[in-house]
Amino acid sequence: MIITRNWLKKYLNLDNISNDQINVALNSLGFEVDNVYDLNSLNSELVLGYVEQSKQIPDTHLKLNKVNIGTKSLQIVCGASNVDVNQFVIVAPINATIANGLTLTSKKIQNYESQGMICALNEIGINQSVINKEDQLKIYNVFDKNLDLKKYLGKDVKQIIGLDDYLFEIDLTLNRSDCLASFQILKELANYFDLEIKNYDNKFNDFKENDLDLKITISKKIEEQIKTISYSNFVLNNHLNKLDSIDDIFLKLNQISSTNNLINDLSLLSTLSTAQTHILIDLDKLKSFNLKLELINHNDKELLCLTSDNQIVNIIGLQTESKFSIDNNSKNVLNIMVNIEPNLMRKQQKLLNTSNINLQRYIKPINPNLFDLANLNLTSLLNSYNLVNKAYKVKVLKQTYKNKTEFEIKISEINDLLGTNLTIDQIKSLFKKLDFKITNKNDLLTFNIDPNRIDISSKNDLCEEVARLYSYDNIQEVALSFTSFKKPKNLNLKLENKLTNYLIGLGFNNTKTYSLTTQIDAKHWNLFNISDFINLLSPLSNLRQTYRTSLSKSLIDTAIYNHSINNKELKLFEIADIYNLNQLKQRHLVFLTSHHIYKNGLTHQLVENNFYYNKEILESIFDLYNLDFSQIKYVNNLDVIKEIHLYINATIYYQKQLVGFIYQLNPKFESENKLNKTFVCEINLDVLNELKNKTIEAKTLSKFQSSSRDLTIEISNDLIYQDVLLKAISDVKYITSSKVVDLYLDDKLAKNNTKALTIQFIFNDLDHQLTEAEINTEFEKIISNVKKMKVVIR
């Protein structure tokens, strides 16, 4: 959103307010100012000129022009195709520096002395993207219906066309979509600086009763997504199809291309002010006043359109189709205003693959009941160009949205929530220039909300608005105080909820599977050595006969089913209980990953699933339970069921108690069931709850840069990695952490009952920045310790 100082000056007295103050105000009010632009400084000198003579230079595309700049006439050679006599133009005289960096000098072109330059807009700082293609190579003709431009020859043309302006480019949050109407930002600044808004009510007031019998039928498919439909109409006087330069430049400064149609351009100016879009139609071109709003298949896209007799009148978000659009001869103009569910319009924008002033407002949550304000503003703009012969009131065809405009809240509630001691008078003064009305009965405040503020829907929103206007910087920082209540504690449940949220945050899907399985599977998948199975006396099926003894098989079956329906990128987890006849109730977690763990649809970047990704998730869970990692042991088990990979598996122990298992499925089993590479981890949460460290210790973080060293070793499968690691780092200083970053297996290693591990060691210190010499000394100790264990270093 762009706001300019000159536009604000039309309504506010800014004589004592600088651009920096406006910048600070906008940021203080929560409107982040991304950029500011001082247009006046782009060009050192530009004056208004009048082309008195223009002659073609033989055998060239150039013209020799005599340009009157008031005190004298200049001879200027110009190559623009549209330069001609009787034009008011922008002239950069000799020694002037213009926005494209060119400093003008007197020089000869085709043996003719050229004493300056007649300028096009893209040469003086206007973005070429908002200049129509046919105008990009043309000089700009200055026009103003209210000025006798001959009296201004030689004067600063920047003031005449609005290039002496200062721009504020504002980033709006979604909840402040109302400020897509510049009138809303105007009110915010008036309130901030305590200024009276002038000329705001200087509007057209001679509206006639609307007797036009127009019907717009809404397709049932989209009926609930259309919030409001209304219309008005105008009878126009004869008119020139030319926008004043100051208005034309203002549109371009707002990144909007003018349409070369005066009425359409004025509607765009109105939309900037009110945020309500206008669909303008030449009434005389309509054969029927029965229109329809429906989804139409147009160019193989299902687009929301306004139609008449099965002909598209307007694709919502774009200009009216030429067959029905207004032109220089239009006398009777229909103005349709709609408000549509933003989700539908976001889909429309995606299909149209474009962005414009109308679509930018259709896709945002804006007050659906802006039609009266918008019609008034558009009519006033038309009237300022002496275009209005008759103007008619708005007729509303559909209005489902009702503004919630009133809230009651006690002053104590506001102060308690914000930590302030505001009085009723102070709160009233915060909203002095805004369209809020505040009354009170004793300490009960009644707020009548600005109907444009549809983001305020609760008391908390209202308190946030008070804080914003009061300024967060003015709210004293006070440490939180807690009142403790004696409540039964269930730390285990809290940890489980955190665990669930953690996995969901990683992209896992929470699943629920059958607790009953076959008796054979219950025995085969009895990883945790559960005894005394629970068998149903009268099972409905042999497939659902026995309570399961682990969760793994259920999740693997879920993965197999998903692969069969081509859903292969899987992250699944389940938390459930295991039972037996001896009143055992064991809480288990199982998670499964299959195929790629990361897939970027845009760049086609893929990251393959691997053991260490799953192990890292597991260790994050251990960290949640505050376990001592030095007490965790991973033991490779060669005596596993056939569905589990013989080498890529580990039985997990903590303080010598069985915690669970982590493994890859056997490639043969994966192939038989058309699974991609799949890893499974199942752990007993009851063991974690029993052995967790309830004492949370705050550790000092080093402010110095850490360094790492990698070491690759060949280790026997008979050795326990944790034991090897503890011996390796014995008496080594500055170690903050270590982890396995790679595992390698080949036929030779497998034959020797070994595997290759790459371990990464992280070094740091709390007191000083470690030198390379210190790190290398300690790393040599690790190497020495490893060699003492007769472990091969690769």
Curated annotation (Swiss-Prot):
Q: Which GO terms describe its cellular component?
A: phenylalanine-tRNA ligase complex
Q: Gene3D superfamilies, alphabetically? A: 3.30.56.10, Bira Bifunctional Protein, Domain 2, Ferrodoxin-fold anticodon-binding domain, Nucleic acid-binding proteins, Phenylalanyl-trna Synthetase, Chain B, domain 3
- What class does this enzyme belong to in the EC scheme? ligase
EC number(s) reported in the record: 6.1.1.20
Q: Which UniProt keywords apply?
A: Aminoacyl-tRNA synthetase, ATP-binding, Cytoplasm, Ligase, Magnesium, Metal-binding, Nucleotide-binding, Protein biosynthesis, RNA-binding, tRNA-binding
- Any Pfam family matching the protein: tRNA_bind
The reactions it catalyses are: tRNA(Phe) + L-phenylalanine + ATP = L-phenylalanyl-tRNA(Phe) + AMP + diphosphate + H(+)
Annotated residues that bind Mg(2+) are located at D455, D461, E464, E465
Q: Where is the tRNA-binding domain?
A: 40-158
Principal localization?
Answer: cytoplasm
Q: Give GO terms for biological process.
A: phenylalanyl-tRNA aminoacylation
**Subunit structure, as described in the record:** Tetramer of two alpha and two beta subunits.
**Family membership noted in the UniProt record:** Belongs to the phenylalanyl-tRNA synthetase beta subunit family. Type 1 subfamily.
**What name does this protein carry?**
Phenylalanine--tRNA ligase beta subunit
Query: Which species does the entry assign this protein to?
Result: Mycoplasma capricolum subsp. capricolum (strain California kid / ATCC 27343 / NCTC 10154)
